Amino acid sequence: MTFKSGFVAILGRPNVGKSTFLNHVMGQKIAIMSDKAQTTRNKIMGIYTTDKEQIVFIDTPGIHKPKTALGDFMVEAAYSTLREVDTVLFMVPADEPRGKGDDMIIERLKAAKVPVILVVNKIDKVHPDQLLAQIDDFRQQMDFKEIVPISALQGNNVSHLIDILSENLEEGFQYFPEDQITDHPERFLVSEMIREKVLMLTREEIPHSVAVVVDSMKRDEETDKVHIRATIMVERDSQKGIIIGKGGSMLKKIGSMARRDIELMLGDKVFLETWVKVKKNWRDKKLDLADFGYNKKEY
């Protein structure tokens, strides 16, 4: 039997459902989600393998107009995938009109010599007439290889999109073992799960000002638990106070929620210790960005 494989980038503005789609395809959480824009900061690989094929999805940060060095990193990380993949899924929401951000991405896609499939997500939120108008509007902007409406949240039409990708794969290698679902180490996934809970439980400027560093992660032979020490980095003392909360209540809630997800991922009991530190203006300092896992060497 011929084995087929290929790399597929998922591009789009912030909050269009890229990570929701990837998690649905993989059948488990490998990319964190929240209602905050720019939740995804790094390129995250999801490896979908069957006995006939391997599709390596690359979930990218939402493309936006950057205001910090971290923003620059995120946008460049997203666009860099155009040099690495065989197909691009350009994801747009069905319930929002085409905007300047979409047009900016379209211009970059036109210049890239890669087939582009338009994926219109969130079809569960609109009337069919609105969906048709949205598809027609985008169809006039560039020549897409396919246009596929889906609901990543409910799973509508996702299998059809996978079938289209499979049909267009070329004969190739199995790049990763069949039981590997992502290229990121466990420490990265742990830090992201903690950051996700901060995003879920805080508001205002805090979500964009937070980074999480896993300081240590090892099994305690006496308790047979994985002992994790992690530091939540913020930019101001006031943010530190909010994350700790009255009597440590917020930090305890963040830790408790994160621990449950980490235990599910690792299949182990976990003892999680979290600390909060202030690192002023870290989002604009290249050394800090590298220390916190946002390294330009990745692209």
Curated annotation (Swiss-Prot):
It comes from the Bacteria. Residues 4-171 form the Era-type G domain. Residues 150-152 are annotated as: G5. Residues 202-280 form the KH type-2 domain. Residues 59-62 are annotated as: G3. One of its GO terms (molecular function) is GTPase activity. It is a peripheral membrane protein. It is found in: Cytoplasm; Cell membrane. Its main location: cytoplasm. One of its GO terms (biological process) is ribosomal small subunit assembly. GO terms for cellular component: cytosol; plasma membrane. It holds the Pfam family MMR_HSR1. PROSITE patterns: G_ERA, KH_TYPE_2. Keywords: Cell membrane, Cytoplasm, GTP-binding, Membrane, Nucleotide-binding, Ribosome biogenesis, RNA-binding, rRNA-binding. GTP binds at residues 12-19, 59-63, 121-124. Residues 12-19 are annotated as: G1. SUPFAM superfamilies: P-loop containing nucleoside triphosphate hydrolases (SSF52540), Prokaryotic type KH domain (KH-domain type II) (SSF54814). PANTHER family: GTPASE ERA (PTHR42698), GTPASE ERA, MITOCHONDRIAL (PTHR42698:SF1). An essential GTPase that binds both GDP and GTP, with rapid nucleotide exchange. Plays a role in 16S rRNA processing and 30S ribosomal subunit biogenesis and possibly also in cell cycle regulation and energy metabolism. Belongs to the TRAFAC class TrmE-Era-EngA-EngB-Septin-like GTPase superfamily. Era GTPase family. This is GTPase Era. It comes from Streptococcus sanguinis (strain SK36).
